[in-house]
Amino acid sequence: MTPVPVSVDTTADFAAPPTKTAPSTSTRTLLLAPPSIAAHEEKLRDIFATFDRASTDLQMLDRLSAGFVSLPAATYDLVLVLTDTDSARRAEALQLLSRDVYSALVPSMKGGAKLQLQDGTWNSAEGLEAILAGLVEKDGAFEKPAYQEAAVPLRLGGKKKKAPAPTEQPPVATGVGFVDGNDELIDEDDLLSDDDLKRPMQQPANCQPEKAKKRRRPCKDCTCGLAAEMEAEDKARQEKADKDLNVLKLQSTDLSDEVDFTVQGKTSSCNSCSLGDAFRCSSCPYIGLPPFKPGEEVKILNNMVQL
């Protein structure tokens, strides 16, 4: 007999009907409720009758303010603060919308998402924290700006700037503005004759010193001769004073002189040195010294006795 081929049925004996999945929506809503609304179940029932529970989240403002709840980033298209239609809970809700709440709320909003109140629009004073958080007021609500990212090309190593071309200088005439150090200088005294040099110098009236007043000081760049004249007077006065101070000083030639009062027959003009007593004459160079011993050699150096 010829073998008969056998086929295996691989189909399932029981096929369940395909389940219908609800179409996913990209719009999500966040409801922020004050703590007092939890005691009114009918309020929550009415709210969820308006919003789809599958795409709506409910959070309590007090828990969000305390940091017990963390919101997903860039998720919600609408944030609605439940204040009741008659504004019964407006003050309670706005009091809980602190800076910490906005710090957690704004990052969870998508670009272009809105923040609204259930009972109406915001007042100017109520939206200060929202503005500080980066939201923009629009049509009685606050909207998060939709920032777009764009790549900006950065050019590195740009072209080097060309050096400016040198400007042409106008031609300068020869011999103008130049000083030649090899030129011979003329002595001004050669231009004066002997009579001009013997003629007394005439001082200007401004430089002549007044007799009744103090001596006039010469100018810093004096050219009338007053400075040289006063310098000569000061030099002569200094030389005279130095000469008066050197009256009592011995010259270097006097160092070789020796005085010996121990030689027999030598006496002073006052005849007191031979008495064997101390020198007491006021003009004696040995005043105050004890009498010399026989044979002692004495020298005078710069008016000082050298024994």
UniProtKB/Swiss-Prot annotation:
The keyword Plastid does not apply. Residues 15-26 have a biased composition (Low complexity). A motif (Cx2C motif 2) lies at residues 281-284. GO terms for cellular component: mitochondrial intermembrane space. Keywords: 2Fe-2S, 4Fe-4S, Cytoplasm, Iron, Iron-sulfur, Metal-binding, Mitochondrion. Residues 207-224 are annotated as: Fe-S binding site A. Residues 153-197 are annotated as: Linker. Its main location: cytoplasm. One of its GO terms (molecular function) is metal ion binding. Its cofactor is [2Fe-2S] cluster; [4Fe-4S] cluster. [2Fe-2S] cluster binds at residues 207, 219, 222, 224. The keyword Signal does not apply. Residues 23-152 are annotated as: N-terminal SAM-like domain. The C-terminal domain binds 2 Fe-S clusters but is otherwise mostly in an intrinsically disordered conformation. The N-terminal domain has structural similarity with S-adenosyl-L-methionine-dependent methyltransferases, but does not bind S-adenosyl-L-methionine. It is required for correct assembly of the 2 Fe-S clusters. PANTHER family: ANAMORSIN (PTHR13273:SF14). Component of the cytosolic iron-sulfur (Fe-S) protein assembly (CIA) machinery required for the maturation of extramitochondrial Fe-S proteins. Part of an electron transfer chain functioning in an early step of cytosolic Fe-S biogenesis, facilitating the de novo assembly of a [4Fe-4S] cluster on the scaffold complex cfd1-nbp35. Electrons are transferred to dre2 from NADPH via the FAD- and FMN-containing protein tah18. This is Fe-S cluster assembly protein dre2. It comes from Aspergillus terreus (strain NIH 2624 / FGSC A1156). The gene is dre2.
